[in-house]
Amino acid sequence: EALLRQPAYLMLPEQEREILWAAALLHDVEKRSTSVDEGNGQVTSKNHAKRGETTVRTLLYRDIPAPFNIREHIASLVRHHGLPIWLMEREDPLKRACEASLRLDTSLLKQLTVADICGRISTDKEVLLEATEFFEMFCREQQCWGKAREFANGTARFHYFHTPRSYIDYVPHDDFKCEVTLLVGLPGMGKDYY
């Protein structure tokens, strides 16, 4: 219901509306298995998004067959639906935002999160909505709003995500040329004596 009240949602192409709608329906699917009463009147659902991603992927593969890119987009939205709220509080927010942008449309992610916030019974809605606005500004600044963050090449992307505290625009030397000799044959044909 909160999603339908967003003007940005109504202006989306039909395919993106359906993806967002499915993600909104399924984003908390694993709260049923992860909810724990902490004993102080507080109920937590740690890792429900990670488990939800797996459940959604399985559901959209086995029970309701969906094309690969649509299935993965919905599963990624479910996995990252809390990212706009807590991004700036975590270690290396740039890496997390860029990583998410490679898997999903960050503008759709913000819409999903806003709908989730508006559908809650909560006293801190304004603070959470402000966090989603900061998320949008941060993604725009880092060139990953509504599109995947672009890197100079695949080596630069790999280096950034696999090297701690690396600079996002660093381009490593990529002269990886070498000569390969590949011997193919049946066993016992003399490949060892080439």
Annotated model-derived regions:
Residues 1, 18, 43, 76, ...:
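Generic ordered-secondary-structure signal
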Residues 2-131:
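Divalent metal-dependent catalytic cores for phosphoryl transfer on phosphate-bearing substrates
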Residues 104, 115-161:
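Charged, amphipathic alpha-helical linker segments immediately N-terminal to NTP-binding catalytic cores
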Residues 140-194:
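Glycine-rich phosphate-binding loop of ATP-dependent small-molecule kinases
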